Amino acid sequence: EMTWNFACSTTETSTWADGGRKFGELMEKATGGKVKVNIYAADQLTNGNQSEGIQALMNGDPVQISMHSNLIYSAFDPRFNVVSLPFVYDSYDDADAKFDGEAGEKLKEILGEYGLHCMGIAENGFREITNSKHEIKSVDDMKNLKVRVAGSNLLMECYKRWGADATNMNWSETYTALQQNTVEGEENPLPAIDAASVQEVQPYCSMWDAIYDCLFFCINQDIYDG
């Protein structure tokens, strides 16, 4: 018998954590109870640090399986930023077609270079921007807005060029920062926004579909081979 730890950045109520739980149910059933999967949302095993959550997966301890965004993986390899170049996709169908095909296979190959087996590429979605100050109807409305962005140099550069006062922050720290007005806005796909109850402290949400990101559902290669 063995126990695997699944980690993700979002909360217990998120679709990411739901995916981990479903995987655990299927593994337990397929192995007759010999493999159990514990769920650690909000990167609990690495004190909320998303990059350290991925490093723990690469090490195979204390994380054996995880679901993290390509944007966080870009801290290890800038090639993962290609997924999130602005205004590349016409629709969700367009993005799905690319990652179900050659682009997805190439990304899996790169993950393999880091000792990871990618079991699937999931949809995180288009990253919408929320804020507590005003409606955003044009890029000019982002001028000097203090916006939390995910840990990606690409996102930092994009939002700075769009005029925002962009800052990086772990997702686990973001709700409190929004509540205390340390930052005035954040950007994320709607499921992550909803799971973290961002709408409680952010009255404005701009649906502009500028940047898309995906999720890599990975297992440590040594664990997979074992």
What kind of region is each of these model predictions?
Residues E1-D93, E109-G226:
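N-terminal secretory/targeting leader peptides
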Residues A97-E105:
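Signature of the catalytic double-stranded beta-helix
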